[in-house]
């Protein structure tokens, strides 16, 4: 059926468009010679689908305006897919043949009977020296006498003990000694001396008001109430300072004798409930005092 599509833009029918697309398709196939070869790259998982599942309906609509053409969604191909694919050339036709593999090497064959391999590395190869252990920086017990400089800044390892004689003769010990002597014997700078002098002067002299306030200042006499309050406060202080005298206990009064008499005790009786206690009281005689060096006596006059 022939009807007009897109009037005002294109006067061709769909049948004419399909016929012209088929002609251009055949012309393109004839124009492609076997000498022109191109490398075909595909993904690892979808290479077979991309080679076989081509859509031809897009070619039939290539004469439509660009506004009405369906847009193809192109997938982003990773770099690893190109590197993992292997390219093989046919000796008779020189047409590339793609085989998807998961190997990290790609083999390329040409008309020459002897194939050669091209190693393609996705990541840079690691050096072989990384697996080796780093050299020990500590000094072993066998090498203590050798002239090997030791890194004294590192932590101490009890498996490889150090020697003070080796440390004393090392450059690190000499450097520490020179730095300490320089720190002790250094001359104080002028800025430090100026700061110290300012601190001393500020501690000796108090901070007074500015001279502009002193010129307008006037001295007022204290009022009579202030003088009386000061006098009363001084008298109160004198009164509290004088403490009352402590009554002295007379030696003649025997307090223990009075307490016994109140309890019913009489002279000549024994102590206790049945009056069988001590009748004669104990007397203390002061003979002297003993020290760590000598024994002295007290002579009562």
Curated annotation (Swiss-Prot):
GO terms for MF: nucleic acid binding
The name this protein goes by in its record: Uncharacterized protein C2G11.04
Stretches the record annotates as Disordered: 16-38
An example Gene Ontology CC term for this record: nucleus
Stored SMART domains: G_patch
Basic and acidic residues biased stretches: 16-28
Signal sequence segment: none
Domain G-patch: 252-301
One GO term (biological process): alternative mRNA splicing, via spliceosome
Lineage, uppermost ranks: Eukaryota, Fungi, Dikarya, Ascomycota, Taphrinomycotina
PROSITE patterns from the UniProt entry: G_PATCH
Pfam families: G-patch (PF01585)
Residue ranges, compositional bias (Polar residues): 29-38
């Amino acid at each position: 059926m022939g009807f007009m599509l897109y009037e005002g833009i294109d006067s061709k029918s769909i049948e004419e468009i399909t016929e012209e697309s088929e002609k251009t398709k055949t012309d393109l196939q004839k124009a492609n010679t076997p000498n022109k070869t191109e490398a075909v790259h595909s993904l690892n998982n979808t290479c077979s689908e991309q080679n076989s599942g081509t859509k031809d309906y897009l070619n039939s609509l290539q004469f439509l305006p660009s506004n009405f053409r369906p847009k193809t969604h192109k997938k982003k191909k990773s770099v690893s897919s190109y590197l993992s694919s292997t390219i093989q050339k046919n000796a008779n036709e020189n047409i590339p043949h793609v085989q998807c593999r998961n190997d990290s090497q790609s083999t390329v064959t040409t008309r020459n009977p002897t194939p050669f391999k091209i190693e393609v590395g996705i990541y840079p190869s690691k050096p072989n020296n990384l697996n080796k252990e780093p050299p020990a920086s500590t000094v072993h017990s066998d090498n203590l006498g050798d002239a090997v400089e030791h890194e004294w800044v590192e932590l101490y390892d009890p498996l490889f003990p150090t020697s003070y004689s080796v440390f004393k003769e090392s450059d690190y010990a000499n450097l520490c000694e020179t730095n300490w002597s320089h720190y002790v014997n250094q001359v104080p700078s002028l800025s430090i001396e100026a700061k110290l002098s300012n601190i001393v002067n500020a501690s000796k002299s108090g901070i007074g008001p500015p001279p502009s306030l002193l010129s307008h200042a006037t001295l007022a006499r204290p009022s009579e109430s202030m003088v009386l309050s000061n006098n009363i406060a001084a008298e109160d202080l004198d009164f509290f300072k004088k403490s009352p005298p402590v009554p002295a206990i007379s030696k003649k009064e025997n307090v223990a004798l009075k307490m016994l008499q109140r309890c019913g005790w009489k002279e000549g009786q024994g102590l206790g409930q049945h009056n069988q206690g001590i009748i004669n009281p104990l007397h203390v005689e002061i003979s002297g005092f003993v020290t760590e060096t000598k024994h002295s006596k007290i002579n009562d006059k």
